[in-house]
């Protein structure tokens, strides 16, 4: 239960700097988001493959990549790539489709995810 009005402390001044550094979103001009719905019991395999992929993706220009999980849907994950501009994204995309090892790992992921619940989107910064 929150404190009563009499027990609340009054702040005399606002903090001069934020406690947490805010992300600089102006750095990303293109975002690639790939969503995955992981089959029951295959979560460990998914993360093993993603750990194997990360250095390979980094080597072809995918240096800003993260994996997020939906808070309300277990085993529903999103891999997010951030690129500074269209040229950086295009260079990555060209190398991505030519790399046989990356293709082999994504082929293994196909068996782990439910394709009908997985998707990818490309977003461009507007503001």
Predicted region positions:
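A compositional/biophysical signature of low hydrophobicity enriched in polar/charged and small residues
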Residues: 2-22, 29, 125
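An amphipathic, aromatic/His-enriched active-site/gating alpha helix that lines ligand/cofactor pockets
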Residues: 2-11, 54-64, 82-118
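Short helix-capping and inter-helix turn/linker motifs at the boundaries of alpha-helical repeat units
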Residues: 24-25, 67
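Short, well-ordered beta-strand segments in beta-rich or mixed alpha/beta enzyme
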Residues: 30-37, 66-95
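Generic structural motif
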Residues: 39-41, 86, 125
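Short, low-order "capping/linker" segments at domain edges
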Residues: 119-127
């Amino acid at each position: 239960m929150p404190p009563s009005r009499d027990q609340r402390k009054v702040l005399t001044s606002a903090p001069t700097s934020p406690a947490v550094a805010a992300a600089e979103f102006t750095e990303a001009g293109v975002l690639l988001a790939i969503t995955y719905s992981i089959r029951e019991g295959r979560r460990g395999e998914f993360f093993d493959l993603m750990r194997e992929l990360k250095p390979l993706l980094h080597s072809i220009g995918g240096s800003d990549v993260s994996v997020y999980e939906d808070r309300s849907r277990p085993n529903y994950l999103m891999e997010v790539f951030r690129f500074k501009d269209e040229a950086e994204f295009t260079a990555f995309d060209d190398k991505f489709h030519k790399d046989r090892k990356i293709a082999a790992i994504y082929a293994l992921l196909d068996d782990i995810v439910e394709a009908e619940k997985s998707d990818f989107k490309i977003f461009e910064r507007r503001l």
